[in-house]
Amino acid sequence: MTIKTLALQCRDAAQVVSQLSAQAKHALLEAMAAALETDAAAILAANARDLEAARAKGTGSAMLDRLALDDKRMAGIAAALREVAQLPDPVGQITRQEVRPNGIRVQKMRVPLGVIAMIYEARPNVTADAAALCIKAGNGVILRGGSEAIHSNTAIARALQGALREANVPEAALTLVEDLRRETMLELLQLNDIVDLAIPRGGEGLIRFVAEHARVPVIKHYKGVCHLFVDASADLALALRLLIDGKATRPAACNSLETLLVHADIAERFLPLAAQALRERKVELRGDAATRAVLPEIAPASDDDYAAEFLDLILAIRVVPDLDTALAHIRQHGSDHTEVIATQDADNAERFVQALRSAVVMVNASSRFSDGGELGLGAEIGISTTRLHSYGPMGLEALTVERFVVRGEGQVRH
């Protein structure tokens, strides 16, 4: 079956999903969560095959962590689907209304986008998360995962499709692309008359390929080169907590810190504290000349290090003379994802917030809060770094659009 045929079937199924009631979607998502629990053993066995193949290829620890499933993570995925089930249904919400002088009633109403192509790497949980969010928002979803997770993704998709069948919803509403050739993905990205939106999540190469070749609208979930700037006025204990949480708790996450910027006035006090805490957590440090003047034992940082999304226990450090230099560094090397300032200076905090165009800006809070669940969205399909209708963590509302609904009593314009 061609990718175009699969997409057409998904579009037809999406029409069915778009008309499901909030109660029906709630029940469907609960059933999808139960299906994952029922099929957990088969899913974990499939994941073990993917992990074995990945280790044989010499895959790094960060990627293995993204790929791996266990009982705890499976329970978390099922729980996440139940959380999505409990979220308010955005479809049909009226976001604005007014009665015009001629008596017509003008409303803006949320409606599903249609068919969403999710293109991603490594993370099998995205298969379930994306399916749940898209269906809750009334959409069909085409899932194109990476070859490294093909067995896991297939097992998860089969379980979820079983729940769709039981609910008399066409299983094409959740379509998994099993042909992983690059040409097939390219063909999918050309189907702008069928697919309404493509969301790539993964490495820089994948996202660039999708952005450069798609005729379908694309919301990029670009790499997370996230910074922490420790200002001269910062509470050093607070800054250290932000640094440890942002770098050492889950370095493979896109909201983990990759670069530390330290004001020169506090470098000699803060850097030794930071180095000791990070060494205890096996973090490799790389710094500029000013950093190495305080920490001579660490490796020098290259220009490439400051633009890198390490996704590992590696941190680039630079000492800066002032806030303006920190802002300039972030603008040059950042990826518009998440930036953090540790400061007790309210004016500097406000300047930091206003001067950066990043999707999420934190003041005295960990970069790890750059997450849909943590920010009150309930769940996210990813973190958009594209300045379109959704910027930053994308929840259910980002998977809908607003259209005008006009109600009248026979009014005409002329």
UniProtKB/Swiss-Prot annotation:
Task: Say yes or no: keyword Coiled coil present.
Answer: no
Gene Ontology CC entries for this record: cytoplasm
> Which protein, by its recorded name, is this?
Gamma-glutamyl phosphate reductase
Q: What is its EC number?
A: 1.2.1.41
Instruction: Provide the protein's localization.
Output: Cytoplasm
Disulfide pairs?
none
GO terms assigned for molecular function: glutamate-5-semialdehyde dehydrogenase activity; NADP binding
Q: What is its main location?
A: cytoplasm
Q: Which organism is it from?
A: Xanthomonas axonopodis pv. citri (strain 306)
Q: Which gene encodes it?
A: proA
Which SUPFAM superfamilies does the record cross-reference, listed alphabetically?
ALDH-like (SSF53720)
UniProt function note:
Catalyzes the NADPH-dependent reduction of L-glutamate 5-phosphate into L-glutamate 5-semialdehyde and phosphate. The product spontaneously undergoes cyclization to form 1-pyrroline-5-carboxylate.
Pfam families the UniProt entry points to: Aldedh (PF00171)
User: Where in the sequence is the signal peptide annotated?
Assistant: none
Mind listing the GO biological process terms from this record?
L-proline biosynthetic process
The top EC class, named as a word, is oxidoreductase
